[in-house]
Each structure stands twice: as structure tokens, then as C-alpha cells.
């Protein structure tokens, strides 16, 4: 738990609620004070769904603090059981209500005696983990609960007759998750691999018993789904892939690993093994436009330009590799806020970036951007805000994001169509060649600057002494003109004819 002005990853209970609201016919109950129950509004706004968000707040107020929470929580659990008739109810405290140190498992046990629905308490330490880690843990807990339950009733362990896959980690409020899921389904259809389950988004908890029937598991995002894949491998020996099919090179690598995972099962079933090399070649040469674009004169204009990349571990690592090895763009600094996955992230990007930044502090990211002065930024909504402050364009490549990055149109980042979308995003995030040249010559079309120059305050002509002229180049280029204008404006107001370093600092104050 952390007190902060702004956080990249939210509190733990948000992760648990995302899991619950991704499944069909699952209800979540928050044991929370007023103020912690913003998830309903946030999800309704961002996901633009027709249905109400199936999450209820069991409010902790002064009466509850005086009498204890048991009656209110149990009553809310039973009420939702009758009203909604869900397959599963997940109870979660928030980091605030966790301070009360109540025995919520006892409340769940009491309600389970009467309830027709399954009820579980989210097994998450709200003081130690964030939204991402809590979502990963909660998904694994739900899968473990239902598979353990089915084991007692004899679980069907027979594999599907044809190659099949589980896609694990598609979530509500995920960054382009719905679009990526469609693209992954299209990819597996092209490879003649059947989709066994997609969890948790749109999945049913009653169908979790069929997870072990798949030939392999794919975890497209490292942040959420790996714990479930580990559990399925340990309990059922299911192989899993955690490579993200983002970018031309990693798409090919992912498909080759799928081939290696499928062929051993094919030999067991007495079927012919698969070879996807011709498919990779065809997609790379004719379907993905990113390959020829990276060789075009447009992309060559980016040579020598600097970028800063920041986001979750999956997207930041993938975009860094795409920029550096597929488009020849220099990545001056890349980073992630996923501190728990820092070792993997460093291993992935160490050969593609001059500097690596692991932090949850957006102020440090802002300082790094100000220091580097990149031509473009690729990050979250916070990096977009930072970019606006410094007048640097930002392409959004990772959560957290606002509503404009929940597009209604089809915008995958994964698969071969995703390579086209990423190429467009990168291209549109830079000032174009001739545009950049004209801006250097004419200084753009800043009308405020024209007005300031044509309407000087007072009639004084100010001059800069030698020291102050030497100081000006030390100021970052993107704010240098503004500093110069504001200093001259300050000098004219004060009646100062000669600008010294002292006048510059006084103007700054």
C-alpha cells in the first residue's frame, strides 16, 4: 500500500474486481468505505458496456465500526445471491478496510452455508501487492478453486482431438485486450488450432473444468496470467508460452514456439506434425505492411531521432524491441513501473536501450524525459501529460490509459495486423521530415509568440550580456524560446535594459 498523488498501478482490490467482472455471471462485493467504490463508475465509462457492472460495495460506516461488519457483509452476500443468482461471488476488502483486521473468511463460511452460489474471499495481501499482482493472484485462485472442486467429482482429463489452446489473461479494462484477443483468435484459426478457452474475459467459471483439455496455454501479457499457467503446468503438465506476439520478429518467434509445442502431441495422436514457416513468410512479406515500411524513406527519416519508452513490462519491452531492431529508431531510455518483474524486463531490453528506468514515480519519468529531450515518447496516459507539458508528441502504448485509448474501431497491437497499427502509431508520433525541417526554419505557427513580438511591453530595447547569452544554450531547447521571451518581458516590466544571469533567475522566480 502506498500514499501517492498518482499511481501507474491501482490498489489491490481493483485487480480482484477486474477478474470478477471479466467472467460471466460472477459478482464482486467490496467491503469498503465510501471513496473506495469508484470501480463501477470507472468501468462503466471506459468499457462502454450496456450492462451494469456486477460489483457491489458493502459500505463501512460509523454504525458498522460500532457494531462490527459481520451482519452487514453476510446480509449483502445473501442478498446478491438471491437477486443476481451468480455462479460465484468474490468478496474483497480494500486496503482501507483491511486495517480493521476482521475475519472475513468467517463471514464467507457463514454465508456459504445458506447461499446457492459459490463464495470465496480474495486471497490477496492488500498492503503488499498492487492491482496487477492482485489480478494475477485472484485469477489463479478462481481457477484453482474450480479445478480442485472438479477433481473431487472426477475431472475429465482427455485432450481435444485437434490442436487446441487456452488464451489466459484477457481482462476487462485491459489495454486493447479485446482487439488483441480477436487478432489472436484469427492467428490460431490460420494455424488450424482450436480455441479451447479464453479466460477470464467472457468466460464462465463453470467451464474452467475444461481448461486441462487444451494442448497448450498462451499467456500474451506477463502481468496477468502467469500464475495460472504455472499452476496448470504443475498440476496437469500443460505447456505454456509467455512470449508476446507483438512485432514482426516476436510474431514469428511465437508461432515457431507454438509449432514446437504442438508437434509432440501430434506424434502421440499419430498425426502429421505442422510446419508454419511458409505461413510466417507469407504473413511477413505480404500481410504485414510494417516490414516494407521500415525500409522506406519515411522510416529512414527517423534515423538518429531519440525516443523514451515507458509502460508495463510487456508493452514497454515489446515496443522498445520493435523501435530498435525493426525500425532502426534509437531508444535513449526505456522503463517500466512493474518493479516485481524488473529482472525479466532488464534482460529483454538491455541490448536495445541506452538506459533502463524501473520506477513507480511519474516525477522521475518526467525528469528523465526533460533530460533526454526525445523527439517522441511512447508511454501511458501520464507520459502523454508529460509530453504535452514539454510539447513532445506521445504515442500511448500501455495502461493506465483514459477513454480515448479504448477505441471503438479495431486496433490490435498483437498479431500481424498489430504490426501495422504499431507502425502507424510510431509514424504519427513523430514530426514528419519536411514538417520538422520547416519548423526548424520558421519556428512553427505559434501565434502567441508573434503577438508577443509585435506588441512588446513598453518601449525598451533590452540587451543580453555575455554571461546570460552563454547561459541560454544550457536551457532545454523545447523551453528555451519561452524562457527568453518571459525574461525579456520581465526585464521590460521592471525597466531593466541589460539582462544578466541575476535577472534571468529573478524572472524565473
Curated annotation (Swiss-Prot):
Principal cellular location given in the protein's record: plastid
Disulfide bonds: none
Keyword flag S-adenosyl-L-methionine: no
Domain of life: Eukaryota
Note describing how the cofactor binds: Binds 1 [4Fe-4S] cluster per heterodimer. The cluster is bound at the heterodimer interface by residues from both subunits.
GO cellular component: chloroplast
Reactions listed under catalytic activity: chlorophyllide a + oxidized 2[4Fe-4S]-[ferredoxin] + 2 ADP + 2 phosphate = protochlorophyllide a + reduced 2[4Fe-4S]-[ferredoxin] + 2 ATP + 2 H2O
GO MF annotation terms: 4 iron, 4 sulfur cluster binding; ATP binding; metal ion binding; oxidoreductase activity, acting on iron-sulfur proteins as donors; oxidoreductase activity, acting on the CH-CH group of donors, iron-sulfur protein as acceptor
Protein's recorded name: Light-independent protochlorophyllide reductase subunit B
Source species of the chain: Ephedra altissima
Amino acid at each position: 500500500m502506498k500514499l501517492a498523488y498518482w499511481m501507474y498501478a491501482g490498489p489491490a482490490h481493483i485487480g480482484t474486481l477486474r477478474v470478477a467482472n471479466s467472467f460471466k455471471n460472477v459478482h464482486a462485493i467490496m467491503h469498503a468505505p465510501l471513496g473506495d467504490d469508484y470501480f463501477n463508475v470507472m468501468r462503466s465509462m471506459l468499457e462502454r458496456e450496456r450492462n451494469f457492472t456486477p460489483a457491489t460495495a458493502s459500505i463501512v460506516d460509523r454504525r458498522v465500526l460500532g457494531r462490527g461488519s459481520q451482519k452487514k457483509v453476510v446480509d449483502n452476500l445473501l442478498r446478491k445471491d438471491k437477486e443476481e443468482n451468480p455462479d460465484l461471488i468474490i468478496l474483497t476488502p480494500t486496503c482501507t478496510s483491511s486495517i480493521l483486521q476482521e475475519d472475513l473468511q468467517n463471514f464467507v463460511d457463514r454465508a456459504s452455508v445458506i447461499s446457492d452460489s459459490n463464495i470465496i474471499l480474495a486471497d490477496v495481501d492488500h498492503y503488499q501487492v498492487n492491482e496487477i499482482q492482485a489480478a494475477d493472484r485472484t485469477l489463479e485462485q478462481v481457477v484453482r478453486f474450480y479445478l480442485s472442486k472438479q477433481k473431487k467429482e472426477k475431472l475429465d482429463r482427455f485432450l481435444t482431438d485437434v490442436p487446441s489452446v487456452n488464451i489466459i489473461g484477457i481482462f476487462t479494462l485491459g489495454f486493447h485486450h479485446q482487439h488483441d484477443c480477436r487478432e489472436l483468435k484469427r492467428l490460431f484459426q490460420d494455424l488450424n488450432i482450436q480455441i479451447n478457452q479464453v479466460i477470464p474475459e467472457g468466460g464462465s467459471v463453470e467451464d474452467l473444468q475444461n481448461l486441462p483439455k487444451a494442448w497448450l496455454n498462451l499467456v500474451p501479457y506477463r502481468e496477468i496470467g502467469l500464475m495460472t499457467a504455472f499452476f496448470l503446468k504443475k498440476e496437469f503438465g500443460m505447456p505454456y508460452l509467455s512470449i508476446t506476439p507483438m512485432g514482426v520478429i516476436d510474431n514469428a518467434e511465437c508461432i515457431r514456439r507454438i509449432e514446437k509445442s504442438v508437434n509432440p502431441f501430434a506424434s502421440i495422436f499419430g498425426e502429421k506434425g505442422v510446419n508454419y514457416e511458409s505461413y510466417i513468410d507469407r504473413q511477413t512479406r505480404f500481410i504485414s505492411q510494417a516490414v516494407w515500411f521500415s525500409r522506406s524513406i519515411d522510416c529512414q527519416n527517423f534515423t538518429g531521432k531519440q525516443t523514451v519508452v515507458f509502460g508495463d513490462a510487456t508493452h514497454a519491452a515489446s515496443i522498445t524491441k520493435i523501435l530498435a531492431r525493426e525500425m532502426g529508431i534509437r531508444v535513449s531510455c526505456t522503463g517500466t513501473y512493474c518493479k516485481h518483474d524488473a529482472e525479466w524486463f532488464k534482460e529483454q531490453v538491455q541490448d536495445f536501450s541506452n538506459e533502463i528506468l524501473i520506477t513507480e514515480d511519474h516525477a522521475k519519468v518526467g525528469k528523465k524525459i526533460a533530460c533526454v529531450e526525445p523527439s517522441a515518447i511512447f508511454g501511458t496516459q501520464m507520459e502523454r501529460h508529460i509530453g504535452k507539458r514539454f510539447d513532445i508528441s506521445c504515442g500511448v502504448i500501455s495502461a493506465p490509459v483514459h477513454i480515448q485509448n479504448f477505441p471503438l474501431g479495431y486496433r490490435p497491437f498483437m498479431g500481424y495486423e498489430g504490426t501495422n497499427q504499431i507502425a502507424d502509431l510510431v509514424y504519427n508520433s513523430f514530426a514528419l521530415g519536411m514538417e520538422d525541417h520547416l519548423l526548424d526554419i520558421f519556428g512553427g505557427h505559434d501565434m502567441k509568440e508573434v503577438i508577443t513580438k509585435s506588441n512588446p511591453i513598453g518601449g525598451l530595447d533590452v540587451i543580453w550580456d555575455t554571461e546570460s547569452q552563454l547561459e541560454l544554450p544550457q536551457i532545454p531547447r523545447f523551453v528555451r524560446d519561452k524562457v527568453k521571451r518571459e525574461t525579456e518581458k520581465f526585464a521590460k516590466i521592471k525597466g531593466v535594459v541589460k539582462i544578466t544571469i541575476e535577472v534571468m533567475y529573478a524572472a524565473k522566480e
